[in-house]
Amino acid sequence: MGGIFPPIFVEKHMTIQRIHSGGEFEAKIGYCRAVVAGGFVHVAGTVGQGDTVEEQCRAALGTIADALEKAGSSLEKVVRVTYYLPDRKDFEPCWPILADAFEDNPPAATMIECKLIDDKYKIEIEVTALAG
């Protein structure tokens, strides 16, 4: 049982809460919209419906806000956000929407250009927020 890695200890009283939104990919892939653990809410990468990147951005933020509310948190408590876009040129049109969503509480952020699960999606957003 030796090895180079130390054992991992988990506090006995730590609870994990899983939040499902009923999204189509949750059951297909085997994940949930958000997990509350260790004082944080971890929201899975979230896409939104719509024809434009702006519509999809607003829809994704709405789904994220709903998950955070179910977890007892909010967009104001987001500490980290990652944006995934197939085309980085689509990011700038989202800036006013994102600035409005996070208002006076901007989180640390990263934007990554990459393919998404389906070509119809133009943006995916993943956040971590303080719980409670």
Each language-model region and where it sits:
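Short, polar/acidic, helix-capping and beta-turn segments at strand->helix junctions
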Residues: 13-132
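Short, Lys/Arg-enriched N-terminal segments with co-localized hydrophobic residues
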Residues: 4-13
